[in-house]
Amino acid sequence: MTLRETIISAPGIDASPDENQCPSNVPAYIVSREQFRDAARMMKTADARLVAEWATDESHYSSLPLPSGEREGVRGRGFGIYACYARDNEYLIVKTYTPIEDPTFPSITKKFAPAHRFERQMNSLMGVIPTGHPDLRPWIRHEDWPEDAYPLRKSFDASKPMQRVKGEYNFIKAEGEGVYEIPVGPVHAGIIEPGHFRFQAVGEDILNLEERLGYVHKGIEKRFESLSWTEGVKLAGRVSGDSTVAHSLCYCRALEAMTGCNPPERVLWLRALMLERERIANHLGDIGAIANDAAFAFLLYQFSRLREMLLRINLKLFGHRFMMDRIIPGGVIIDINSDGK
């Protein structure tokens, strides 16, 4: 039984197809807020995995008629709650809606462990509340953010600096004889990005490790709202410099799905070539870094040399070491012949 058949035939779940879903080969079904967790249970029973969970502010649609497939009472014209599931090569999106005056929805963390951080992030940035979540401490939002600051809400004004306040993050505490804490970060030696790690230990035995991230949250998602498509793809390509091809392609594929644009086959092959070269370069760098963490510095030097050779070939083929800005909505900006010219 497919995931689509599972959600349609699930007892006690009234799921209706979202006929406006893009891309059309990833079906989406709308359920009531009360049935959102039941749908997760059915996906778990079907051996599906949770790919992602996110929220959207759809309050600005309140004056528009309901789209096809969405029933009165199901869509509250407030926040959209989405969960994407996968099994093998099949994907399915389950969505529900929660009103602005009561932005709650049933947590699916107890069904799918990865939802734990997804839902904490949704709570931090959108202000929706996953009821039944075991840990609703702020994840992305830091203690100097005002209580009512939710950057991904449409009402949030990103044109001026956020007013800062005083606050304190409540780390998990371990108590007992001989228990001590080791704080690491958020500033580290080297060039890695910031992150705070709180170790609790007895002797050399680690009892608990808690990560505190989000120090480089830049408001990128909010920034996309004010950009044109051509500006947006440039921003996407700068989310992570060494993964610029992957991020640019994701942005372009989303636009192409919404507009029904089908790039030519040659464009698809050129994009695939750039993706593979980016993947190989990053794997070479990562393997070398892993070896270096185990004090095998010589292997790091060798893999770094191979990675540099690959990046120099990228420059010759595509005009940029990391192939930044080579992918645009609907196509690519560069072509190569069989001689690589």
Predicted regions and their residues:
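Terminal low-complexity/charged segments
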Residues: 1-67, 76-205
